[in-house]
């Protein structure tokens, strides 16, 4: 049988991929959106012609432990231009079920990425800078389409530094005005 290619990303992989290098073939350093198309195309080519995983190291933001290439962290500069899920899975279990997700029956909407603070102890500040925001217009359109597709009554605002979002009050008013419940998780 053929071994699958194992890909990892996220805060821990971005901060220090080496401890998992024996188990992971490819690490995405930073955010996947800017390189997702290129990575998927390379995976398709890789499946057709078996090669060494080092070919992935030529993609910005991809770390392959066997490669000696320096890795540049990739990040989305304009959140308005990047995709956001507008049809989210909602558990079909009782609210008291241990299988209910932490956010429950809600539409999770990301307003910000990164953080404007410079806390020395915070991993997120160092790997996910600079802070970026979605425009109010974009957030509203995500909510409209997401609520239509997801069939829930609650919107959760997601962001590492959500209270620094310049349109927080406006988006909260928008959600409440349209009769939805509002959640701002810590």
Please provide the spans of the model-predicted regions.
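Glycine-rich beta-alpha loop elements in corrinoid/cobalamin-binding modules
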Residues: 1-70
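Ferredoxin-type iron-sulfur electron-transfer modules in oxidoreductases and energy-metabolism complexes
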Residues: 95-99, 132-144, 148
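Active-site lining segments that contact anionic ligands and/or coordinate catalytic metals
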Residues: 59, 79, 104-108, 116, ...
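Conserved, mostly hydrophobic/aromatic
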Residues: 25, 115, 139, 184
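Canonical Radical SAM [4Fe-4S] cluster-binding loop centered on the CxxxCxxC motif
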Residues: 100-137
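Flexible loop/turn segments at secondary-structure boundaries
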Residues: 14-16, 35-37, 91, 116-120, ...
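Conserved SAM/AdoMet-binding glycine-rich loop
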Residues: 143-186
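N-terminal [4Fe-4S]-dependent radical SAM core
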Residues: 65-108
